Amino acid sequence: MILKDSLLTLLKEKQMAAITVKELCELADVNRSTFYAHYLDLYDLLAQIEDELIEELNMYLSTYNFTKEKEALQMTEKLLEYLATRQDECKTLLNENSDSSFQKKVEDVAHQFIMKNWMAVNRLDQNFSEYLSAFIVSGSIQMMKMWINNGMDKSPK
């Protein structure tokens, strides 16, 4: 956990490519051998942080029935509440210092969820649904980034 927190701290200040294992271990006050006993490299550590958040996001999405408008609105509210509980990690992983892999993973999860749940309900053409999903997902992620960067100045409701 301390290595994950230390990497997130460093990502607030500098680009991922500029961070070294030595620097991370000094901040975390652990030996490099301890780091390498758990991770292949810094990108492996970053991927584990991202995957943990993505797994939680998938759990949130799977609890809602997107076909019912009321539940779709509740789902959006719950997602924003989830982001609020993981604000620091999400803000850091979606900033310009991190690589784009986390945003891409979030986009993929959201796209799959929309295609699985929305296309069938609305009986839309797959090709049209792909474009519509890309539009919705991109806009939603930009809105979430803006909301987080503005200190979550609006209520999830």
Where are each of the predicted segments found?
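An amphipathic alpha-helix adjacent to DNA-recognition modules
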Residues: M1-L8, K12, A17-V21, E26-D29, ...
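Short amphipathic alpha-helical interface segments enriched in basic and hydrophobic/aromatic residues
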Residues: L8-K12, N58, A84, M115, ...
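Generic structural signal for secondary-structure transition and capping sites
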Residues: M16, D88-E89, M119
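Short, hydrophobic secondary-structure boundary micro-motifs
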Residues: I19-T20, K91-L93, P156
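Secondary-structure edge/capping motif, primarily at the C-terminal ends of alpha-helices
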Residues: Y60-Y64, C90-L93, V121, W147, ...
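Helical hydrophobic small-molecule/effector-binding pocket
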Residues: E69-M115
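Amphipathic alpha-helical packing segments from all-alpha helical-bundle domains
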Residues: N97-R123, N127-A134, S138-I141
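C-terminal peripheral helix-coil segments that are non-catalytic and often amphipathic
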Residues: V137-S138, M146-K157
